[in-house]
UniProtKB/Swiss-Prot annotation:
Membrane topology (UniProt): Single-pass type I membrane protein
Composition-biased stretches (Basic and acidic residues): 29-51
Region of interest (Disordered), ranges: 29-61, 92-119
TM region(s), chain numbering: 6-26
Residue intervals annotated with topology Cytoplasmic: 27-291
Alphabetized PANTHER family for the sequence: CELL DIVISION PROTEIN ZIPA (PTHR38685:SF1)
Quaternary assembly: Interacts with FtsZ via their C-terminal domains.
A family per Pfam: ZipA_C
Gene Ontology biological process terms, A to Z: division septum assembly; FtsZ-dependent cytokinesis
Record keywords, A-Z: Cell cycle, Cell division, Cell inner membrane, Cell membrane, Membrane, Transmembrane, Transmembrane helix
Function text: Essential cell division protein that stabilizes the FtsZ protofilaments by cross-linking them and that serves as a cytoplasmic membrane anchor for the Z ring. Also required for the recruitment to the septal ring of downstream cell division proteins.
Gene that this sequence comes from: zipA
Subcellular location: Cell inner membrane
Full protein name: Cell division protein ZipA
Length: 291
């Protein structure tokens, strides 16, 4: 730090000397130019001559007395010369710097390192925003009314053997085929609207005994005590005509095998029971028309 001050003092002194030299040189140059530009006038009258000296009338000119002013080579007024004022200011600064240089420089105490407290980031707490109460959505259950399945009516007729001798498969299956019944789905026989077996089913024939099927490998080995005829309402075509055809087929097979026609309760068929079947069919037709 002290060496830097010495360097600044030396540089300041050189700058002041340069400014002084420049100022003196400029002043001399201005003085010479003023003296050289002045016109030559007549010589100064001797100082011992009286000022009221008369001249002859014949003189064609008058000697003009004028005091000659010697050129001033002195230093101009410092107040009007900016260079000199600057030099004075620099001199004052140099004197102050010299005085500061004489003052012993006390060693500066090293600043004690401050203990830096580690910054602990505080957890950001989310603003307490009141939560809107969510009203439970009331779901209105719409009762979908499923279409009610149409109630099926089943009309059943049975053909049972007359005694203890069961129906043998050979004669039974032969008689059934002759009356338009064909073996098909669910291992039972069906009567189709078309005798070729491609039309809609009008009624079907199953085994009266368990398990209800008429499945057989050899007709001669098959035997049963009876078969059941059944038709469902609604059915394909006219239900009354289908019932007449089913009743006629059952009576024909019973005649072929020597059996009896029974109702759904396995009782002998009577005219009153036949009327009850017909009435059941009529009532079904009325309900179907009103639906």
């Amino acid at each position: 730090m002290q060496e830097l001050r010495f360097v600044l003092i030396i540089v300041g002194a050189l700058a002041i000397a340069a400014l002084l030299f420049h100022g003196l040189w400029t002043s001399k140059k201005e003085g010479k130019s003023k003296f050289g530009d002045k016109p030559l006038r007549k010589m100064k009258v001797e100082s011992d001559d009286p000022p009221s000296r008369a001249f002859a009338a014949e003189d064609d000119f008058e000697i003009i007395r004028k005091e000659r002013k010697e050129p001033d080579f002195g230093i101009p007024n410092q107040q009007h010369d900016p260079l000199i004022s600057d030099f004075a200011a620099h001199d004052e600064l140099d004197e102050e710097e010299d005085e500061e240089a004489r003052i012993p420089v006390q060693p500066q105490s090293q600043p004690q390192p401050r203990k830096v407290q580690p910054q602990v980031e505080m957890p950001r707490v989310a603003p307490n925003v009141p939560m809107a109460k969510v009203q439970p959505e009331v779901v209105t259950e719409i009762e979908v009314q499923e279409p009610q399945e149409e109630k099926l009516d089943v009309i059943v007729l049975n053909v049972h053997c007359a005694g203890n001798q069961p129906f043998i498969g050979t004669k039974l299956f032969d008689s059934m085929q002759q009356n338009g019944l064909l073996f098909g789905e669910m291992d039972i026989f069906h009567r189709h609207a078309d005798l070729s077996g491609t039309g809609k089913v009008l009624f079907s024939v199953a085994n009266m005994m368990q398990p209800g099927t008429l499945m057989h490998d050899d007709p001669a080995d098959f035997s049963t005590k009876g078969i059941s005829f059944f038709m469902t309402l609604p059915c394909f075509g006219d239900p009354e005509q289908n019932f007449k055809l089913m009743l006629k087929t059952a009576q024909q097979i019973a005649d072929d095998l020597g059996g009896h026609v029974l109702d759904d309760a396995r009782n002998l068929m009577t005219p009153n029971r036949l009327d009850a079947y017909r009435k059941q069919i009529q009532e079904f037709k009325v309900r179907a028309a009103q639906a």
